[in-house]
Amino acid sequence: MKVLVTGGAGFIGSNFIRYLLQARGDVEVVNFDKLTYAANPESLADISANPRYSFVQGDIADPSAVSQVFQSELDAVINFAAETHVDRSIEDPSPFLRTNILGTHCLLDAAKKTRLPRFLHISTDEVYGSAPAGRSFTEEAHLDPRSPYAASKAAADHLVSAYANTYGVSAVILRCTNNYGPYQFPEKLIPLMIANAREDKSLPIYGDGLQERDWLFVEDYCFAIALALEHAKPGAIYNVSAGAP
């Protein structure tokens, strides 16, 4: 089984590549990553010599680069590649629109042309907006993104569903809550809080500080992604969480 992982040098992508190579001895992984500010190639240093792992530097929003990497016979694509930092999306939405929407479109177009057997799109629960206190979202909930980042991911989700319905692309969408774990980008909340606390710096408070979030350990999410890779229903959307804010 040959799997293309986009954004595999990022936090969740790198953890998933390591998980998949360890869990499945019959899987070959191609890591396709632009290596932006959030990438951490060192997170994959321990598997770089694995004969079942290869790396290709490229941009998912570049049609020619995507077309080239799709020339090998792929069994699945898992799209982790994304601009994900909410504050950065507020400062400048343009990179988020390019990568998260146009990049996803390039991948879907290639999947359509090559009749890819499986396309997993890694989305986020932020496409739903803010839930009322004590309530959670189902997969049928209305999308109500509240930031340029969330809006770009919601648009990408709609594209994935449209390609599944219109062209028969065997696509699945996973919407996960916040992850934490090894190799997480230091600007993210938990690493930032820990670093600031260790250095006796102030801890950032967002809004009134009373928000509740569901946090999921990244290796548990990797297990869920691997499960979806094997068993998810084409065209389906799955929420993934720990279920414990």
Predicted regions, residues:
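A short C-terminal helix-loop "cap" of Rossmann-like NAD(P)-dependent dehydrogenase/epimerase domains
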Residues: 49, 167-170, 194-205
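N-terminal Rossmann-like NAD(P)+-binding domain of SDR-like oxidoreductases, especially those catalyzing
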Residues: 1-179
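Glycine/proline-rich active-site loop of Rossmann-fold NAD(P)-dependent oxidoreductases
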Residues: 154, 179-192, 199-201, 205-206, ...
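Conserved mid-core alpha-helix of short-chain dehydrogenase/reductase
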Residues: 65, 106-109, 215, 220-223, ...
